[in-house]
Design a protein with these regions (language model features):
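Outer-membrane beta-barrel pore domains
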Residues: 27, 53-55, 211-374
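Boundary at the C-terminal end of the N-terminal hydrophobic targeting segment
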Residues: 21-23
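Bacterial N-terminal signal peptides that target proteins for export
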Residues: 1-9
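Outer membrane beta-barrel
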Residues: 25-46, 54-207, 275, 279-300, ...
Length: 374
């Protein structure tokens, strides 16, 4: 499925929704549920995040306007299709997100076919509307694969999950196939405490296409200022481990990822990254957990919930004295009003060494996001 086809599919549902065509039949047959979210805000950053070294840049952003339709029929079948629209400075982009059909078998066993997220990384699998920070960590953005075309089988119990899939990148089908798998388990899971452990791995075929990791260092509208070496690659191996601990109002998560990439000439290059993040709720609330993921907060009080967030993320994209090493320290404050409105304020302090684009890679950044779910 090419990009243009994805855009058309994503927004073809809009007139159907407006006419009320998507609804339950009321007879226990096919049912449909329409939902989505709008995330918008402001990014302000210094020379670090600008490849030309501009000292001060401010952008209004539409981080994502997502529309999602979930279908279910019979006792075992379901499907989902969603599309998103983003505005990043002068750039506007519409794309197809998930588009799959799924069969649910006995004992929580499921088979999925279509386009969806590969089973890799706790943070990557978490919806943007459920994140604690303004963006996913630099490590997740750099390493964890996103949505691809494929087929996947998995089992999703409340305290343990596993998934295995065969995929092809719909944006670059010439890159070949990938095999990706993830397992997770919560050996401790009670009303007040959760301990989550997980691991994932992926083998990826590149067919001697150009390979380079590029990242905007956790600011959506910034330039891709953190980069690895660029070369033609044959294949890569990706691995990650993850852990999470929730105790009453406190939630701590961490992931470490490593990727080995084989160049056309046969030598292997190695890149690594990771993050640790903590969130402390100042109100009498806690983040729920289910089936290998920490979910979004639903405040108990009509006055909402407040959360303090801190994160440190780092990547080492440097090998053979080529590429960059970078880190970002983030502090933030979140406000949750009901289950549908979230306000995120982040302050980011980045550092970089090795090869860099900006002539003066200094200056911090601030981001503000308003997320509304419907």
């Amino acid at each position: 499925m090419n990009e243009q086809a994805g855009k058309l599919l994503a927004f073809a549902l809009l007139p159907m929704i407006g006419s009320g065509a998507l609804a339950s039949d009321g007879d226990g047959g096919a049912q449909a549920e329409v939902s989505g979210y709008i995330a918008a805000g402001v990014d302000h950053y210094g020379a670090f995040h600008d490849e030309d070294g501009e000292e001060s840049t401010t952008h209004g952003v539409l981080r994502n306007a997502k529309l999602q339709v979930e279908l279910a029929w019979g006792d075992a079948w379901e499907a989902e299709i969603d599309g998103g629209y983003e505005i990043e400075g002068d750039n506007k982009d519409a794309e197809l997100g998930d588009a799959y059909v799924q069969y649910n078998g006995p004992d929580r066993l499921a088979v999925r076919l279509g386009q969806f997220k590969e089973p890799f990384g706790m943070e990557r699998l978490t919806s943007y509307s459920s994140l604690s920070a303004g963006e996913r960590s630099m490590a997740t953005s750099a390493f964890a694969p996103g949505r691809s075309l494929g087929v996947m089988v998995g089992q999703y119990r409340k305290s343990s999950t596993w998934a295995l899939g065969l995929f092809s990148d719909e944006r670059k089908p010439e890159d070949g196939s990938a095999v990706t798998a993830r397992v997770s388990r919560a050996p401790v899971r009670s009303e007040d405490q959760v301990l989550h452990l997980g691991a994932a791995a992926s083998w990826r075929q590149h067919r001697e296409e150009e390979f380079q990791i590029k990242d905007e260092a956790e600011v959506f509208s910034a330039d891709n200022v953190v980069r690895s070496p660029r070369f033609e690659a044959r294949e890569s191996r990706l691995a990650g481990v993850e852990a999470g601990w929730q105790f009453h109002r406190l939630t701590v998560t961490a992931e470490v990822m490593a990727q080995e990439v084989r160049r056309k000439g046969g030598e292997w290059w190695r890149f690594t990254g990771g993050y640790v993040q903590a969130g402390l709720l100042l109100t009498d609330d806690q983040r729920p957990y289910e089936r290998g993921e920490f979910k979004r907060i639903k405040p108990k009080s009509n006055g909402g919930a407040l959360e303090l967030v801190a994160r440190y993320s780092a990547v080492d994209l440097r090998d053979r004295s080529i590429g960059a090493e970078a880190s970002v320290t983030t502090v933030g404050l979140n406000y949750y009003l009901g289950k549908d409105i979230q306000l995120r304020l982040n302050y980011l302090m980045p550092e970089i060494s090795g090869n860099r684009l900006s002539p003066d890679p200094g200056g911090n950044a601030a981001t503000l996001r308003l997320v509304y779910r419907f």
